[in-house]
Each structure stands twice: as structure tokens, then as C-alpha cells.
Amino acid sequence: MTLLAGFKVVQIGGGSAAAVCGRLMADVGAQVTCIDPDAGTTLLAYLNRGKAVAATATDRHASLAAADLIVREGPPKEWAASPYVLPELRRINASATVVTLSPYGATGPRANDPATDLTLFFASGISRQLLGQVDDLSEAPIRPVGEQSAFIGGLAAACAGMHASLGNQPGASIDVSIHEALSTLAMTELARAGLGHKSWDRKRLGDGNGATVTILPASDGYTAISPREEKQWTSWLKAMDSPAWGNDPRFVPKANRVKNWDALHALMSHWSRLHDKQWIADTAQREHVPSFPLREVSEHLDTPQLRHRGYYRPSDLAGKTIQVPSTPFGLSVAAGRKQDAAKGPLPLSGMRVLDFSWVIAGPTTTRYLAAMGAEVIKVEAPGSGDPGRATELHTVLGQAKKSIVLDLKKPQAVELARALAAKSDILVENYATGVMDRLGLGAEALKAVNPALIYISASGMGRTGPEARAVAYGTLLQCYAGFAGLNRHPDIAPRVGFAWCDPMCGLMLAFVAAAALRHRQHEGGVARVDFSMIEAMLWTMAEPLVATQLGTPPKPVGNASTRHAPHGVWRCAGDDDWISVVVRSDAEWRALCGVVPGLAGMAALDLGQRIEAKDAIDATLTAWAVTRAASTAADSLLSAGIPAAALARYGDLVKSPHLAAREFWDEHGAGVLPGLPWRASFGRATGPAPDLGADSDQVLTNVLGLSQERIAELRTSGALG
């Protein structure tokens, strides 16, 4: 059963991010019709497969008039000359949600700057962090594999558009910035910069986070491990057959492992090179230590886990039948009653979310739900609560939520949780498989107290299949999926890198939650969602998955491109300052030659000739860039119409006139915190993140109707921590 049966989407133009938005909608059952689609690349052909095309003026008008959601992509100047300007779309259909995607948003001084995947990753700051910390700053920053700016932008558009389409916001308009969608993946770093705290440095300091998660060489590749807790470290030593150095005081406790990381990694590597990557991961998992092998994308095309979950479906592409991803979640839908849309100023006004999630992925999901107006009640354990509280993570992801402390080891606390679930619309949890069931808070158990509850579970591998109980973290899953292995320069070993998987999954989950609400409203069905983070990773890695099956398996290429030349990054004057430059056409090449004097004699070169002359072009751009400030160099190229961007630091984004003009930042005490990657005509909810348990009494009184005397009894019993 699909979530969006009867939901009609019109996708206008050839933009990749709009195509991703339409692909996600189609994968969960929407009827997607394209106007002027582009199938010029394998990725676009994949994204637009199976969608209807409105080829005539009559068909286009009819599709637009019937649409629930219209999505289009491009900077404002492109739409000004288009027949699909907003007033015309409103004349045809006054009630549809219209989502406009663009590189830098529809407003602000950078709104019409030319941009590409590479330059957006530079401008967002994500390229500075993607590889993690490096030993040598001469190693160039890179973009990730597979046009990921389109996937992140498309997910943001789908999330915002789905919420706006829930029924209480007819005629909503949404402006999605791909630049902001990328930047907001790094919530912790944005918050640190906004609050004036110490910011992240690309130069490796200490262990470079290795004591938390690292990659070890194996006899046939690499394996990622994450024995971040002392208990896990003890188990990891057992998995390595209790080496003599395991009791060395240099490596106990974790603070000492951080301090002596290079020596420790060398010792572990000596052991790991004797074993194959899957054996290491299996041995670690048997000891409940999070670990996965670094796989090639091709290794995921036929696995017992994905077969069990029916993840792939056949599709014809480029004259060949290949396997393509389906939805990254299992879905069961129980019959129920149709429910009216929320009433209030925001899409989720009046909706209650019971939030059992922690750290990044789940709290990112509920951050979006809170911003869209839901009352989010965050259930935390006594003591320190969500580990995200130890950093700025909770400060930003906890915004506009409520916090209640429940000690779920106490039966009375479990009963309180059940009572709250009985009065909630959505439950979100990302505990290890089996935990909620053992507590009596699983989907089946709560169905008895609230048949209308939408129950969303997120886990590394999904709740079913032979790997369902594997211990996983998002950073390990991006290694397992093949993402980390491809995101590197050809001559450099893979790194874990930036925690990409978790915030990406959180964004996708927020879309799924809104889609499930719409299904409950229109069909009466109540969804049980079993979300798999590895499947979500592979869904966004469609380009390498498809290329592998069409005979061109991807390899690590750094910033190289076969479609554009030049396409790369060059070091500028200053401390670890870089510029990215992309030339997409002969006209842009001639413009570049007009800015960089040393290229003037090459102005007549076409694409093939520029690829052949790569070394000479690189040398000229290297000499030109190294004497200039990155921002100055980028501005000179942008003024000539050439996509370019300086490698942003998060502090640069805090000071950005463009983001200020777009009101991206929210005031927070003496600093600022990042907002959402879209501007909606209906706005969003704001508010500070709660202290641990700050709302316990209020929630128990207002939601459950408990007296102060009863609350005092529960607190004395330990149920409230």
C-alpha cells in the first residue's frame, strides 16, 4: 500500500533537485507529471522514469489545474522569462502548494548567482568538513559522489511541500534554498559558529574523532568500527582476542585513547590486516560493537538483508533492465477513520508528537515537525538525558520542543508513556531493534491504546531481515553503503568523514511523517513506518548504483568531472582558503579566459580540448588563485557569469549578508541559531530548546490531567527520575 495515492504532483523543468523531489513523491505513490523534463544525463533519466509527461499545452494546463503540489527549479531570473511564473500558476490553480527550488533561494543578493553541485558544497561549508580532519592541508576539499546537492535540495522541497499540502495551508508558496539545505546538515557546527563557540578545524588535532569512529585496513579492504563507549571498548578488545596492549594505561580510559591515538591505531591496524573486512565486522557485531565493512556499491545489489526487505525493483533504463531502489522504509497500514486536517496557523498545529529519539537522526526529524507547528514532547532518561545535550546539538535540534523525564525502567513511567501515546498523533523512536517492544511500547502494544497513532521507527538496517539487530551508527552506515569509499581522492585511503547519514535521514523521515499524516487524513489508514538508514543512503546514491549496472562502475575521483572542464578547486592566499570553479559551456570558458589573463590564449578550446589541456589549465589557475583572497577571486568569476565559490567557514555563514537578507538566522541570547532551509508563506514555530525535564509537570497536568499530588507521588517513586 502507498502513502500518497491520489496525490498529484507537477514537476516543471529539467532541474535535478526538482526531479529528486518528484522521484520521492512517486516512490510513495503520488501521481507525478513532468512539464519540459530533461533526460540528458543517466541520473535524470533514472529520476524521471515512470513519470507522466504533459506534452501539449492542453495537457499542461489540465495537469497544473489538478495538481496538489507544483515543484519547479531555477534562479529567479530564469522564472521571470518563463510561462510558469507564480502569478500564472496561481491563475491556473489557486489552491496548490507551489515549491520553488533554487541554488541560493529566491531572495537575497546571491539569488541569481550561477551555481553547480561543487560550488554549492563549497559555499555551504560542507566541503570543508566532508572528509573529516586531514593531516595535510594541501589535500584539497571535495564534494561527495552522486550530485548530492540535488538529493538534499530535493528532500528539503519534498519535506516542506508535503507539510504544506496537509490541508490547512491552501495556496501556500515555499522558497527552498539548496545552499541552506546543505548548510543545515551541519547543525552542530552552525550552532557553534552562531553562538560564538570554538569552530571546527580541518587540520587534524589529536585523534581527529578516531577514538569515536575510525576505519581499519583489512586484508581485502577496510572495516569501520565505533567502540565509543567504555563497555564497547572492552568488548572490542575481546573481539581482537584480548591483545596484551589492551591494558596499557595509554589507552584507558577514552581520553587516553584520544591522546595516544596514532600509536593505538597502528596496533589495531597490525591486527586488522590479518583478517578480511567482513570477518572483522561480524566478529565485532557478535560482541555488540558497532562495525561494518566498507563495501563497494556493487556489493549492495544482492544482499540477504535487502532481498528480505524487497528493497530493489526492476526498471528499464538505457536499454537494459536494472535494479533500482524503492522506498527506504517498510510500511504497514491498518484501517482507520479519516481525520480532518489540523486547524491552526501552521501545517501541524494541534498535532502531538511523542519523541523517543536521540542524538541526530530522530531529533532532526522532530525538529522539523516542531517547526511546522507540532507539539513535540521529547521523552528523556534521568541523569544527562539525550547525549546531544553534551554539545550544541540539542540547542538547535531541541528548538520549540518540550522535555519530560521518564525512567522507563520503572513500570509507572512506562504507563505514563503509554498514556501519552494514547493522546498523540505520531510517535518517533530510534532505539535499538527490540527495545520498545521489551518496554511494552512497541507498535502493536500501543495500537491497543491508540489505533490512530502513526508509529515511526528508524534504525540502521530496518526492523526486519537477517541484519536487523546489527548495532549501527550513521557514520558507520555511510562507510557500509560505499559513500565514504567514493568520497576521496584516488590516492588517499578512505575516511569516515562528516556525519552525513543522520541529518539526511532526519530530513527524509520528516517527509515520511507528513506523508503518513496525509494518508490518515484522506484514506483513514494508520501507518507503521520501519525506516532503514542504509536504504536511505542507497536511495540517495542512485547515480553510482545505476552506473555500476550500466557498465561504468564509479571510482574515487576527487573533484574531477567528465561533463565539465575545468571543474575543480584551487588553493588561494590565506590559511586553508580555496576556490571552486566550474565551466559548463564554451561561453563560460571564454568568460573565464577574460578574467584569468594566463588563459587568454586558450579561449578557442572546446570541451574535449580543455580536458586534454587539463594540466596546463590547472597550472594557470593555480598561479592565478594562490595570489588572491578566495572571496575576491570568487566574486570576480561570479561577476562574469562563471559558477564559483570560496570554501566557506561556518563563521562566514553567520556574517553572510545573503543569509541575513533571507532571515536564515534566529536570535538566541547573545548569538544566533540556524533556521530552516526554506521560507514558507505560513512561517514556522520557534522557541528555545528545553532544559532536561523542564516540561514534565506541565505535560503531565495538561495532557494527562494529573494532579500535583499525583505528580509528587510519581516523582517520589522515581518514575520521573
Residue ranges and their predicted role:
Residues 14, 147-150, 358-359, 409, ...:
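Alpha-helix N-cap/helix-initiation motif
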Residues 1-41, 55-107, 130, 134, ...:
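Acyl-CoA thioester-binding alpha/beta core of soluble enzymes
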